[in-house]
């Protein structure tokens, strides 16, 4: 077991993300987790992530605020509020945007590639 406190985690720059701060809470280097990692993303108003797809599974869980998931052309946007979550399967594309004027905080769980 390894406890992690918010004070000890360090921010990192998530690729293709903007106007946000990412914190890695658990992972190989942080706690020895071998199959997945967990992070916390703080999105400023109009912050988000560019459209991207990867072969990894993702779970997003909104703690505070609101984020909009944009699955791509012709697909309906999905808005997540506090305590809402979404599973994004391998190779499913998505963009993320905080369309509000309030910050949003989201937990992120992603598996490591095999």
Q: What is each PLM-predicted segment?
A:
Residues 1-35:
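A short, N-terminal "cap"/entry segment at the start of jelly-roll beta-barrel domains
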Residues 24-27, 37-54, 90-91:
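Conserved short histidine dyad/triad with adjacent acidic residue
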Residues 40-44, 54-69:
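Short, conserved beta-strand element in jelly-roll/cupin
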Residues 41, 87, 102-114:
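A short hydrophobic beta-strand segment most commonly corresponding to one strand
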Residues 48-50, 65-71, 85:
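Short beta-strand segments in beta-sandwich/barrel cores
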Residues 66-68, 93, 103:
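Structural motif
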Residues 74-90:
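Short acidic-glycine-tyrosine-enriched beta hairpin
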Residues 98-99:
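Asparagine-centered strand-capping/turn motif at beta-strand->loop junctions
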């Amino acid at each position: 077991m390894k406890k992690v406190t918010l004070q000890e985690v360090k921010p990192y720059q998530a690729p293709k993300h903007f106007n946000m701060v990412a914190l890695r809470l658990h992972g190989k280097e942080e706690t020895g987790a071998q199959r997945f990692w967990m992070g916390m993303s703080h999105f400023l108003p109009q912050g988000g992530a560019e459209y991207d797809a990867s072969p990894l599974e993702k779970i997003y869980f909104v703690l505070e605020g609101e984020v909009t998931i944009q699955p791509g052309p012709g697909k309906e946007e999905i808005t997540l509020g506090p305590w809402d979550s979404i599973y994004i399967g391998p190779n499913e594309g998505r963009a993320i945007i905080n369309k509000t004027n309030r910050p949003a905080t989201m937990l992120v769980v992603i598996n490591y590639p095999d």
